[in-house]
Design a protein with these regions (language model features):
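Two-component histidine phosphotransfer core
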Residues: 1-149, 161-163
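Short C-terminal beta-strand
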Residues: 157-167
Length: 167
């Protein structure tokens, strides 16, 4: 219950649409703890974070949405866990956030549709389109291809690379 309360407090905190990377990672940890209640062995979460970027300001629910998508769409089979790695690197002009999973991957057609901002299913909610729009706003409306890159191999992996300018 404590984890659920913490998650809802963080996600429903209106007025704080931009939060620190550290706060976003806490939201991700809470989300995964909640997801593990249904199936305790379904997700293995790994981190490779440059600690000097923990105060980096990012749109709330950015990484969480990508992790949620990995769990929702990437799991190969009911009893086969998915490994998700979150990497945050400091580059010269920007930070790079990478969320990678070893799930079912995406076809080239699906990647193209995502990059065009198309909804992939009728019930999809927050999703990648929202993440892209929010990152574009804080990145001086950079082009989609400058903000995000998707690499994927069907039945192998998906890697999403996001670039955020330093503010």
């Amino acid at each position: 219950i404590t984890t659920l309360a913490s998650y809802y407090r963080a996600t429903l905190n209106h007025g704080n649409d931009i939060i620190s990377l550290e706060s976003e990672l806490n939201i991700v940890r809470d989300y995964v703890k909640i997801a593990l209640i249904r199936n305790p062995n379904i997700v293995k979460l790994n981190y490779d974070i440059d600690d000097s970027l923990l105060n980096l300001q990012i749109p709330k629910m950015t990484i969480q949405t990508l992790v949620e998508n990995s769990i929702k769409y990437g799991i190969k089979a009911i009893d086969q866990p998915i490994s998700i790695t979150i990497k945050v690197r400091k580059l010269i002009t920007h930070a790079e956030i990478i969320v990678e999973d070893d799930g079912i991957g995406m076809s080239t057609d699906t990647i193209d549709r995502v990059m065009k901002g198309e909804r992939l299913e009728a019930k999809s909610g927050f999703g990648l389109k929202s993440v892209l729009n929010r990152i574009a706003l804080i990145n001086d409306n950079m082009s989609l291809k400058d903000i995000m890159e998707i690499q994927s191999e069907p039945n192998s992996y998906t890697r999403i690379i996001m670039r955020l300018k330093y503010k």
